[in-house]
Every structure is written in C-alpha cells, then in structure tokens.
C-alpha cells in the first residue's frame, strides 16, 4: 500500500482519504494472524525496500535519523510482543537483498515532486510529534 502511494506521488498523483471507499484486501488470508513471525519479517524487509526503491540517495541521507528512529521504535514494539528477533531478521534481509530491488527511474519533473514530498514528510512529522506530545501531556495531567 505505502509503496504504491509513494510512487503515485512521485508520478504526480494525489493520495486522498475517502471514508466511503470499500477496499477488499486479503492481507492476512495466507499469512495468518495480525502478528506472526512471517508477517513481522516481511513487514520489516518491505519497509527497507519502500524507502530504497522510492527515495534518492539525498533523501535517504536527509531522512536517515527519522528512518533509524522509526526502525528502533518498531523494533521495541515487536520485541515487547516477542517478535524482536524476527523484526531484526527481516530488516537485515532487506539490507542484504537491496541489490535485487528496482528503483523508481529518473524522469522529467521528478526533483520538484521529490522536494514537495520531502516538505510533506517534514510537515507531517512535525504535526505527529506535536499531537503525540499533546496526548502524552494529557495522559500525565490525568494521572497527577
């Protein structure tokens, strides 16, 4: 899902939220429950692929602190659920097999779209941090 959405943005499409939309997806149809070893490994690997395939090197470097922080937070989440080793295994598999991934090619107008996407990522991160901080402050206020 994320890969298609990111690539669509690169090619000039808008991603919009449509609450009335109905999507049929057999995501867990063959892989089992919400979280299992197979799905955790696959998700970790695919997160590596998503960024590598769609971002140029300058974006990977610019976003690396946030990407690494997000990877660490996901690792902690899956470790708490008993899937820490599976997450690391999938992440490392993604790194090892990057050479098999086909990156989105260059095309006219891509740099402008990349800059636009980058600004959206920065703004979205700022909003997320702000809202997360407010939720945490509200929790602390309720506990005091």
Each model region followed by its residue ranges:
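A short, conserved alpha-helix in the catalytic core of glycosyltransferases
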Residues: 1-22
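Positions that flank functional sites
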Residues: 22-24, 67
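Nucleotide-sugar-dependent glycosyltransferase catalytic core
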Residues: 24-45, 76-86
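Short alpha-helical functional segments enriched in proximate histidine and acidic residues
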Residues: 50-51, 94
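Extracellular glycan-interaction patches encoded by glycine-rich segments
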Residues: 54
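Non-catalytic, C-terminal membrane-associated alpha-helical segments of glycosyltransferases
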Residues: 60-144
